[in-house]
Amino acid sequence: ALNILLIIVDDLRPSLGCYGDKLVRSPNIDQLASHSLLFQNAFAQQAVCAPSRVSFLTGRRPDTTRLYDFNSYWRVHAGNFSTIPQYFKENGYVTMSVGKVFHPGITSNHTDDSPYSWSFPPYHPSSEKYENTKTCRGPDGELHANLLCPVDVVDVPEGTLPDKQSTEQAIQLLEKMKTSASPFFLAVGYHKPHIPFRYPKEFQKLYPLENITLAPDSEVPDGLPPVAYNPWMDIRQREDVQALNISVPYGPIPVEFQRKIRQSYFASVSYLDTQVGRLLSALDDLQLANSTIVAFTSDHGWALGEHGEWAKYSNFDVATHVPLMFYVPGRTASLPEAGEKLFPYLDPFDSASELMEPGRQSMDLVELVSLFPTLAGLAGLQVPPRCPVPSFHVELCREGKNLLKHFRFRDLEEDPYLPGNPRELIAYSQYPRPADFPQWNSDKPSLKDIKIMGYSIRTIDYRYTVWVGFNPDEFLANFSDIHAGELYFVDSDPLQDHNMYNDSQGGDLFQLLMP
């Protein structure tokens, strides 16, 4: 049986060389992409950590997990739904969790869903507890809890950072599993580029400020309904941002500071890339690259000033569009010859790392909720059946698609752009709001405060969103109570700045809104 290495990154938008970003240096992830099938149009089902992770790890949508906030455990609150690692464990795999896989806290029962999901207790890096403490040296020489936090690693508590510790632990587990009779499922969850941007300061050198531009559409668009806007409260709480005294809810953040946020996000991505590089290089050294599927994705994107917005918490592409790629030995790339390395470590500071061509790509719209059936299918396990509606009583079923057909190539020289009919495909996302206007809890409303749900569909041609009344006691959306709508056409308005909703009463689109 093939092993699985699932790499989940926190808050990573597709700002990667393999997704066409010319600025960001991500040679190791690009190298993985060159041996993988990469999905150009993959979307998360809700752009916030806990709901997205519970959704894709169970293969069910947020309306089924009933988790839109950070305050409940799906097995108690919605249904006893199986997870990806649980399914692999029940099929004879040793399942292991390193770093941030499930969102910690009540949403995974304070145990990362143990013992259901994991063969032994999940690993959390000891230095994680300093992530939000005052460890950033400010211009005044004092330590602060800042948003921008490039550090000298020898100076920080424990002399290390969480993602470095997670990589080391994951490599140790791979060494252990090399001789194991059972196949393994190893999930590795990286923290960066999640805020605060606490990363080794040398990565800043890759992105001189004079090379950093603002978002091409850094103003709040005229036609944006206020309910669609997220006021990025989490950023405002950091000491360096507080000091700027930015007006609520729309800002803007001063231009110079916008550049610095973008610089630190990209630097965090390059730091993350080195950790992924070390992990994949170890997989190679242990001769596991010919027997291990590698899946790489993120829980959602992150706005970097587009539409005058920052962070996640919205239905825009910048918040919902994620990287998604699968390396399948012998299928997406030829098996490595003896002694050949598929994943030699690449140094982002080495200017010789040429931009690599991605391997195979699919332009089809896909959803993170399809990760479960796809990993099961690639590993040769039985693919869980489609869920009935409703499916609260069904423990094992899938609301996503099995993407296996994308991996059926006759030979490796075939056209790397896979044919499909993208016109038929839809990716669904949603986001709750407590009010029609942005307020202190608009980014992360608690279930009891949700008054409006924004249901959004993304096709190859458009993104269409309606914000409708929502009753949190009954978990019921009222589609006749429309608070606002958005419609953006991808070809003419790729950045989603010109809301065409009022011009085109989207009646025919309406029946598409429910998966």
Label every model-predicted segment.
Residues 1-479, 494-512:
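Formylglycine-dependent sulfatase
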